[in-house]
């Protein structure tokens, strides 16, 4: 039977105490096929009861539970009869609230630590080795477990690394099972989700699509919706999902600012408009944007100009449409989490629709606001969007304008666009496109002496940036095979005008950012 709302799914909620890893916990649970949400630590008991979760996870956090102002939970949460897992600060909080003792550690643990499972019957460690390495990040520790709890694991500097109360189904781990640095972290979370909470893996993208289509139709009725289409993954998937739900009641405004990658605008129109039938108005505004950028060299100023101009073009087109009641945007769950509030009233500037005039009164519709990025990609493929479009490289809103260092001109954009197309073509030919997080070319504005044919040249340099990463927060430069780099370099110099040198960026993030501007 199809699910019609979120209450039809088994779910495990994560209460947020400020850990840098809190989103990861939610992602890991969803990866198991179980719906999960990250919610405020002070979520009311009434709301928790209404959600009827199969389990609750307390995230880690930077506070000390014994300090004034430390983040707390309503003590009634321990009387709900719902399984609870405390991670790091979450374990300390549960221990403290239930009568245990938490103190500052003599030796803080940050990074890898080896633990020993001391209880062979520990449910969280069922089927796992007695000795394993985990990721610790704490300055406090539990020095006395609450009454009714047993210690199930220890480390050299943390004698109480895990605790359990099997009767009440309360568990705590001092380490971060959600990060990949914990050897069997995912297995520990699985044991909690399936063996302790008895949750069913019934969260599927097919159900989500059906649920969202029903919700969109109910909310929109016979009214009209507009969407600012950037050509990126989020807005493209939003447009396709809305079209599936309401057809031509949706109008997508695609502002082509001339800073897109080679053939990208045409590819978007082919995939979404011609193949999938989405109603799109394409505005060719390349000259308008270039005129505004003339003489501008500061990267932040370029971003602001492009963002402001995008809004103005979008506004002009939106005003031409009659009787529009809804504005759609591709807000993701990460945006909702980062805002810390209900973002239903927030227009996101990075979706290029921020700053709408006060006389344009739209109700906001955000069909992706419960999904993470990789779930959006899965949704896009389910909706029939071409694989290459769904899995395209991350691309900044200002586009190639920030890959041309200094002033942006039509000739410089052409150089970056052509060199980037060559890079992507050779990476794809080498079968490396799925192994590299992001790769692109930049025009740093450096000119150098070269020799081409029998003559001396004084032309531009192209920089190649290719990185590997898991989440984009940190990144290493990709170790591309020399023969692939050689082919890329040769083709760029041969096929791109005014280029006589190619360099490869071998800097990690940090200290560098992935983009050059």
Swiss-Prot record:
The keyword Membrane does not apply. ATP binds at residues 230-236. Disulfide bonds: none annotated. GO terms for cellular component: cytosol. It holds the Pfam family GATase. The active site is at 88 (nucleophile), 176, 178. It is an enzyme of class 6 (ligase). Residues 11-202 form the Glutamine amidotransferase type-1 domain. Gene3D superfamilies: 3.30.300.10, 3.40.50.880, HUPs. It comes from the Bacteria. Pathway: Purine metabolism; GMP biosynthesis; GMP from XMP (L-Gln route): step 1/1. Keywords: ATP-binding, Glutamine amidotransferase, GMP biosynthesis, Ligase, Nucleotide-binding, Purine biosynthesis. Its EC number is 6.3.5.2. Residues 203-392 form the GMPS ATP-PPase domain. It catalyses: XMP + L-glutamine + ATP + H2O = GMP + L-glutamate + AMP + diphosphate + 2 H(+). One of its GO terms (molecular function) is GMP synthase activity. Catalyzes the synthesis of GMP from XMP. Homodimer. NCBIfam families: guaA_Cterm, guaA_Nterm, PRK00074.1. This is GMP synthase [glutamine-hydrolyzing].
